[in-house]
Each structure stands twice: as C-alpha cells, then as structure tokens.
Amino acid sequence: MTTHDFSSVNTTISIREKDFLTTEEWQQLLDAKDTASVSLLLQNTPYEMSAEQLEDPDAIETVLMTELRRTYRWLFELSPQSEVIELFSSIYTYHNLKVLMKIRATGRDLSTLLIPIGRFSIEALEHLVNNLESAIVYPTLVEEVRRTWSEYEAYQLTDAIDVGFDGAYFAHLRMLEERISDERVAPIINALVDFYNVIAVKRAMELAKGRSFMHTMMTSRGSVEKQILIDYIENNELSNWFECQDNVYYGSVFQKATKAMDEGTMTASQLERLKDDYLHQFLYEKRLESDGPLTLLRYLVGKEAEIRNLRLVLTGRVNGLKREQMTERMGAIYGETI
C-alpha cells in the first residue's frame, strides 16, 4: 500500500465535500421559523425531509441513519484499503456483536438495536455469534467472539459481553493500525483509545467508584499507562496529558478545556465532545495533504459530525430547545477551524 493509491480517491472526495452544509446554511436552520422553512432549506441536500417528517423524531432518525449507512457503503467501495474506513465503522461492528450475543444469551428480541454499518453484514456477524466460527471475518475476530462467549458462560452476566467486546474493539483498532501501516493515522487511533480511558475514569469518579473499577473499565491498548491517566485525573492534572497531543493548534476551545481540566470541572460528557473536537481539528489541519488516507477520514469524521449536529438541531426543535441551547451543544462544522 502506498500513499499514491489514494490520489484519485481524494480527488473524488474533494468534489463530494461541496455537499456539506455551510455555516450560512446552519445559521438558516437554527433561525428557521417553522418546519416548512426547515424542509425547504434541506431540499437538494442528502437530508431532504417533509414538514411532517420534521415533526417526528423517529422519522428524522431514519433519514439521518439512512444517509450515514449510504456514506459508509460508498466509502467502503471507494477506498483502496477498507481498513481505513474500519477505523470508524468498527464501533458499529462491535455494537452489533454485543447486541447479537445478548440475543443469544437472553433469548430476547433486540434486533431493533442493530445498526447495519460495517465491513461485515449483520448476517455474517449473526452466523459468527451463533456458531462461533466464520470463514468471512478476521480470524482474530472469531477468537474474540469465542473468548467473550466463554466469559459469559462462566459468569452468566451480560456485563461480561460488554466488557469483553470493549476490549476486543480496541485490540481491533491496533490491528487496523498495523494493517494500514501509515504513521499519519496513529494520532487518530491514540485519540480514540486514550480518550476512551480518560472518559472511563471520569465516569467512574462521577459514580464514586474506586480504582479497581477504573482499571477494569480501561483498556491497556492506550498510548499512556492506565495508572498515569488515573493519577492525572484525580490530581486535576489531566491537562498534562492533553497538552502532549501536539498535533493541533490550541485555539479557544482547547484552551477552555485545559482550564476546566486544571480546575477539575471537566465532565465525562464534555470529554466526549472534546474528543470529537480534537479529531475534527487534527484532520482539518491536514486538509492540504493530497496523498494518503487522511482526506477520506476527514470526510468520514465530518459526515458523522454533521449528522450528530443535525440530530441535535432537528430533534431539538421538536422538543422545544432554544437556539442558544442548540448552538452551545453543537460540534464543529465541516471545513472550519475551532
């Protein structure tokens, strides 16, 4: 695999980038007086909806997820290396494995929780979970499914399924890193893993859980040792970790975040948002690179963010959120620095 394998792909992406909603369009959506106005604004976008659909959160979600699934299918077809897309589709694969194994374990119908996004079909994953074998998926994935099922059988707790597949997911990310073999994706993978650990510790603290619980919830696949991160958070020194992520310019958003870290006021939900902001800014600053997988990843991360923002704004309107409440919760807009 060479960086030049992505040249034609990146040209295609540069054309499709024009379909992202602009800052002006976002302002118009936020200022729209009624659903008819919103419907008019969304015409000729991938998110076209009627005024009636815009009054129904379930209908909104259907349109948004249809577009997300379409995007992933298109990118899997477009990318010369499917592992690049898997960096972000794998979260859905492991979510589906959790659901399918819980269906097997409990006999309950949880099929509405399945999300058909990923390299492997729902049918392939279902066969894997039910038979503990597959000629389609990675051998390492077969091993992880077998191990997780064995742990469930030993403890008879569905929590074992969640813990088992969480660990497997991060091991999978590191496997993808090796397969992609491009040092430019390392900061992305480190961010996905390290932020998970930081958020796990913060959530444990918010629930008044001890260190043993924290260690159990964390993964050893991070770039920073578990105990170091725990010490940073407990001592309000998390900015020591975050400021070492020197792959982005530290504008006002990140300066505000580090201040909250030093004051010990940063919450788990705020860290989730910070992770998204970091990935956005990292990929934004690499926007002039014409070779390699980062252009494709920037598009994918941008699409995920746009759909999150639309979900917030469109369902927020249904639920009566004020404009200020929506804007303060929105993530970054594609093509802009933060």
Regions found by a protein language model. Name each.
Residues M1-I338:
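N-terminal domain-start signal
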